[in-house]
Amino acid sequence: MYRLLCLFCFSGLLVQSQVQQLDEVVLSAQRLKSDIQPLSATIVSDSLNLNFTQEIGGLLQQIPSLFVSSQQNFTQDTRIAIRGYGARATFGIRGIKVLLDGIPITTPDGQTQLDHIPLSQIGTIEVLRGLSSGLYGNASGGVISLQSAPIISETNIAVALGDFQSQSLMAQWSKAQEKNRFRAIVAHQKQHGYREWSGFENTLVSLSNEFDLKNSSTLNIDYSFFNSPYAYDAGGLTLTQVNENRKQARQANLNYNAGERVQQHQLSARLETKNWQSYAFYTRRQLDARLPFVYGGQIDLGRDYFGLGTQTSGTKNKWLWQYGIESAAQHDARIRFENNMGAKGEETLHQNERFYSLGAYGITEFSYLDWRLRTALRADMHRITLTDFLDTNTGKKDLAAVSPSIAIHREFSRFFSSYVRWGTGFETPSLNELSANPSGKTGFNNALEPQKSSETELGILFRKKKFDASLTFFYTKTKNEILPFELETFPGQNFYKNIGQTTRKGIELEGNWQFAISGNLTFSYSRGHYQTETKKELPNVPKHQFATTLQQHIGKSTLALHTRSVGARFADNENKVPVPHFWTADVTIKHNWRKSALVIGVNNIADTQYFDNIRINAFGGRFYEPAATRQAFLRVVVSF
């Protein structure tokens, strides 16, 4: 639930993030250790420092076809959509696989919350656009892979203040010895929020330990604790209410005390040898939420999520390969109560939901002269079970999928290459989506089916010493697309249905130009159509996006300008409610002095009025969550 404060306090680093040339590094997100990338990919890094950057959405806004929203709603979390996948998310990220050092953060049913990850420890972020179920299985409409920065001996303290009573304190201490490296991060944030009833407070602790073993093996053990005692939800407004007072909260959200309390523990371990990599993890998350309606308006959700995986890689002559197996389980204990104006009432739902996943995959790559042929095949089995303690709707559902992909890459010269790729994807309904039964009864909505997709992609890459660019065309078909809707009898609650076949087609352009020793410009543009069988555009997916980042070093200071243009989109399935285009610009100045740094900046310097989030198909026209206007911030970082 890192949100608006992160944009205030850490934009000085966000706008300095750069897109590396794809031939400079090996993408860990593609699993195979190859020096070519026959797929649309972007690597976000920072030549200065990613320390104390917390809001992942701000780091990713320059990536084509990737749309970030709900960055200022501390209850619903940042939402990220890649080529339209993830746009329907109600809370957090949906339909996109997220990894931290190779360990899945995404649950088996396809949901992701990033509030427990201290991005101050992240060194690079890799993003794969397009279907990736052949690599990662369920709900892989794209991949976001977070890689931790190497642990070195250092101590950092950062203090930040900003508009809307934003406060942040972060401390990091790390020690690197010959065969052991340790890092500890503590962060605390608090903010009143731009809108009424939109504040939050949270604390995070992260511990990382890395051991060097025999035979060049390494063992990593990580633990994180996250606690948010409160995060309030201001709710969606009608356009009339926005025009009257864009800072106001929806009255029902005030009446029902809408918001949440979250606590999470996560423990993970990774073992890497020359040819083998294995991992295991366990996560415990407790959510107590209050929604703005009576029946089922209070939620007590206890989630246990755990898994393990192992993979082996090898090479011989002109072949590369990797084979692996992964297993994960998700146990949700879901209880709902009446919400009597913020007070807990009678129990309306009590059920245990289980999601078990087992997958095996293989990836091979064959090289011949300037050609590369890569294939991937993955098989997944899922079992979903429900135990209903209030009624007789106990049951189970078994799902399976086989996901192939193939890509051909051609290196025409050291400056120019191209590729063509075909891949598949599948996405099961999440436990939250299944448990939202529009009949009003307990149990799952058994009418909801998985969505399945296939995609063709053509890419062209050009790279020189001071300039690189890529151009990508994609075409995707999806069957049984899942979208949310609301009912008059349950206003504010999302239900889900399959709407039939959809198509996604578009073009993506991105580039990086070092126009001087001290100056750099990155840019990206994407344009696409995301349509149903009736030629209606999918809601909350912009038709086009354009972003630039201009960075200039002047002595010990850095001036950065980040601009973002987001095209028009729709708030409903029938395309009767248009959401207008908007443009924003952020300016940041950073000055380094010895081991300290001072950052001063202004976000949304043009004072643009736009919407941070759109509630898809909201009943009563309450689609709109206004974004903050102009904001100033100050941050001080001291290193020892």
Language-model features: where?
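Outer membrane beta-barrel strand-and-loop segments of large Gram-negative receptors
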Residues: 301-312, 355-361, 445-449, 455, ...
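Short strand-turn segments of transmembrane beta-barrel domains in outer membranes
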Residues: 124, 131-133, 143, 147-175, ...
